[in-house]
Amino acid sequence: QGVDPNIHKIDKPQITPIATNRDKSSEFLAAIQAAEVEAVQPVFVDYASDLSVGKMKQDIEVLYKQNTTNGLFSLYYVYDFGTTTDPAFGIASDYFDLLGTDTQSLQEIQREFYDLACSFGIHAGGERIYVTISGLAENMDKAVKLAEEYMQNVEGDDAVLAQLKANAMKARNDAKLNQNANFRALQQYTFYGPEAIRARTLTDEQLMALTSDELLARIRSLSDYEHYVMYYGPETEAKLSAALDAIHRTSQELK
């Protein structure tokens, strides 16, 4: 690309040598070095004893571990399918993150979660989709209700969707000019072949043809699918199951 003649060189400053004292040590360091430390023994997870497996309504499996350290909880709804099964789920989850409902803006919903000291999100991975709710355990019921109402009542915005599509198209075009991205694509092609890549990736035409209703239907339909629940928090297993039976929305018959 040539040499820029406008670049001005700056003289390097003189570096003052630092006298080291590697042969000396403080009393504090000497005490630490002289202390005998017991070797740390490895600890392995035993799923039979470290986790409890229970059931809630609709025969949904609940993986439970009590948090005895603090008053925080993490709750996951895990669906055994993802963008490998339906690549549009990735776009749907990104779109959902930018929307409000017919009665609340996105900022108002975020403020409600903030006031509850809780967070909520939907992550669409290749093999699984995770709905995550976490935060202060005393507000779990309110946070779950807010999250599930948000999922069912989310309202589309065509302007937001158009910008999301434009960003996705730009990212695709930028990736074509990125050597590392091309190497990764070639690696995926070598591992899985062209048909697998086509099945996992929306074409430009498919991406641009997606509608707001199609994408949000995927979010709303999660309550219709089989899934399992993972919980880590201070609530007892019995109280957790009772709470989930009362507040977790599911269809009468899961797909």
Label every PLM stretch briefly:
Residues 1, 63, 69-97, 101-153, ...:
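M16 family metallopeptidases and their MPP-like homologs
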Residues 1-80, 87, 216-217, 225-255:
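Proteolytic maturation boundary segments
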Residues 22-26, 31-34, 158, 177-181, ...:
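Low-complexity, intrinsically disordered regions enriched in charged/polar residues
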Residues 148-158, 246-254:
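A common structural junction motif
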Residues 207-210, 214:
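Acidic/polar surface patches and capping/hinge elements
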